[in-house]
Amino acid sequence: GDVYKRQIICGGTGLYIKFLLNELSAIPEIPPSIKLEAREKLEDLGNKNFRELLSKNDPVSARRIKSGDTNRLLRAWEVFTATNKPLSYWHEQSRETGSQHKFFKVCLMPERKALYSKCDKRFLDFIEQGAADEARALDSINVSPELPASKTLGLLELIKYTKGELELSDAVEQAQRATRLYAKRQLTWFRHQLDEDFLIQNLSCSKTVSDCFKKIVNFLG
């Protein structure tokens, strides 16, 4: 095939990767009127009551989705209202044969201690680059805590720091801990859910990278 049509996809979010690797049954398009009705109902009831109402029609999704996850709550409600089938039904329609495309899956699984050290340093770099000022600016415009941006790792801790509710050292420590826990969940997901073609545990090992490159060349034919 044309080499320019070959794609390299890099990411760490397990659910997106799962959807990419498996050809899922397409969910019918949701009419705008249903989307509007769902949002109005959620705003009227509040997230917690809306989730309880969702559980009567789609208990599987309601159990999986946290009350604060507005977007996913709305999506589950919209799908059921439009199709009269729960979102879990559509997720179960994935084909066992997987995607029509061929993938060579490379998984980066660094040693946990090294990974956690990088997580800690990464957040310190954010601090040096002005993350606290960004947190203060975001808080000043009263962004909804239910928006995805408000769930950024470390944001809540930095906002507490800017309000004088936490010392900077405590905010950093708590944010670093949250980041490490997130990384741990990702490692667990990849270990149990991804059937990789090549595993890289040491990025600085030239032989490992060379071996991976050779396998990719063989895969491409």
List the predicted regions and their residue ranges:
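Phosphate/pyrophosphate-binding catalytic cores of soluble transferases and nucleic-acid-acting enzymes
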Residues: G1-G221
